[in-house]
Amino acid sequence: TYTIRELASQEMKNSAGATWDAATAGNAIGIWTASFGDQIDVVVSNNDGMGMSMFNAWAKDNKVPTFGYDANSDAVAAIAEGYGGTISQHADVQAYLTLRVLRNALDGVDIDTGIGTADDAGNCLVEGEDYRYSEEDRSYYALNIAVTAENYNDFTDSTRVYDKVANQLDESKSPSKKVWLNIYNASDNFLSS
């Protein structure tokens, strides 16, 4: 039986107001360990930058499982050194879904081709495992994946193409197109906020 109790929390802003600041998180774990010592059994962070800062500053030496979010390359590699795990937002599937919907529109084929229905090259994702479709939103969503000691090696090569959708389409049926695709958040301030 486990008891979950929040010992402390803090908004992680630096003096310039930037949020989710790794250095602030590293400093916070020092303050918290001075106050709570061996009462800290696990560290959970909203991102791997802060998680890795707390892991390197204290949790690694004290063998306290630390978990983050984003599957940053340093966090994935640190799983071999005791970092508890992270969450991949499945960026490869996010990119594939975006480009595949665009490709399907350009080719004039069913929107689900190569997503939930195999295309001529055999590309097909698994709904509920790789993505979900919302009829109400008319949107595809990549599903997050837990990255743990059991599977972290699958996430060490960021250039690896996702096997389920790695096959090239026939150029004669899907000719090359010149497309400008610009993606950013609505406020266009993600890195500066």
Enumerate the language-model features and the residues they cover.
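A residue-level marker of the well-folded mature domains of exported/periplasmic proteins
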Residues: T1-S193
